[in-house]
Amino acid sequence: MRKIVIHSPRAEVRALIRGLLSDIEAYFVPAATRSELVRICSTTKCDLVITDDVRMFLNGSDTVAQIRKGEPLPQIFVLSHDLSEEAVTALLELGVNQFISLPMAPERLRAKVASHYRELV
């Protein structure tokens, strides 16, 4: 079964993302901290990571490599209000697969996730 890790320091954001994706057939794993996210990704097979924490990628800790230690290599979607060219470019250069600007239409996130899974087939 597909596994999606939803990471956010805020429980209400994790719940909101989970609710928006309720029609996607997948096992959802919540992660509240960066260390929890890295642990989950290194100990279980996950297809997709969705996070709203831009800082963890930009702090020099090589979070993308830590998330992608195992197989399969999960796609990483980042949700953020920061639309600066520097932030978006840095995230993409670090290996983030999708940058989704907030606020967003719920359909947009569902479409991005559905598209990701169609590509896997």
What does each of the following model-derived ranges do?
Residues 47-67:
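Conserved phosphotransfer microenvironments
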Residues 32-48:
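Acidic, metal-coordinating helix/loop segments flanking the phosphotransfer/catalytic sites
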Residues 104-113:
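C-terminal output helix
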